[in-house]
Amino acid sequence: MGILSSLLLLKRNQKPKMLKDIPYFFNGPAPYIFAHRGGMSVRPEQTQLAFDNAVDYGLDGFETDVRLTKDEELIVFHDATVDRTTNGSGKVCDYTLKELKKLDAGFHFTDINGRHIYRGHQQAKILTFDELLEMYPSKYINVDLKDTPSSYEGAIAPKKMYDIIKHHHAEKRVLVTSFHKKQNERFRAISNGEIATGASQHEVTEGVIKFILGLGYHYHPQADTFQMPIKFKGIPLSSTHFIQWLNLLNIVPGYYGINSVDLMYDLYQKGVHTIVTDRPDLGKQFKSLLKQHLSLIHI
């Protein structure tokens, strides 16, 4: 894209007159580095083993997911079934919490040498969302409501989520999102702006299309942040101009699947606020590099 066309695109996507306020969740020093499912490349995902490891590396928080059990408990879990990550089989919603707690969430995890080093580990257990907030009171939590809106679990999960967050007085350190637009709408209606929310895939797609067409000034999102991959179906989503446009709208830009220190630094320089990685060790390397860079600037 040439300089003239870039300037014209930004002009056409100019800042609207009325903007949403940026929630307190994003008030900390940027960038935030979050461990994806606790850092799933190096520890069994969504377990205390993973979250403790991310804390040890000094990351700011976690990106995680929740699903509802048979007895209506919110657990920290990604898949609709337990097969991929545990020694169990079947749907999460067909298990009670007590039954899920008996499963080995480190059963299928392998290290770089192909060894199952965390099978049977006491800290390789499924956690509830309540336990996660209790165990890590100083960490930011970016949580994705996974149950589909049309299911019974999906219908009641947003209210369950809200009640747990309120119980822990965690309104300022939790970001709630979902790939499903309906779930985001439900949670926003319940929380009434108290808690930061992310964009659904539909909301992100709408924003990207309007930006590309130069109709960005017609975009009035409810979401506080976009969380995206670097590209989607061949369409790049991390251009400097797109990130600038998001910041102009007070939509906090965030990217996931970032497992390169160089890419983390590139995104930071473009104005990205939140970076989600599978590798907490790389997150720590980046934070150290950034600290050195900033100290040199201020000499």
Give residue ranges: language-model regions.
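Metal-dependent phosphodiesterase/phospholipase catalytic core, i.e.
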Residues: 2-17, 78-190, 194, 221-249
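N-terminal amphipathic alpha-helix/helix-capping segment at the start of soluble metabolic enzymes
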Residues: 6-35
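Hydrophobic faces of well-ordered beta-strands that scaffold small-molecule active sites
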Residues: 33-35, 62-64, 141-143, 174-176, ...
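Glycine-rich beta-to-alpha transition loops that act as phosphate-gripper elements at the mouths
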Residues: 37-38, 45-47, 178, 201-203, ...
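Catalytic domains of carbohydrate-active enzymes, especially glycoside hydrolases
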Residues: 53-67
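Catalytic cores of alpha/beta
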Residues: 185-187, 261-272
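Glycine-rich phosphate-binding active-site loops on the catalytic face of alpha/beta enzymes
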Residues: 273-286
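Conserved small/polar residues in nucleotide/adenosyl-binding loops
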Residues: 297-299
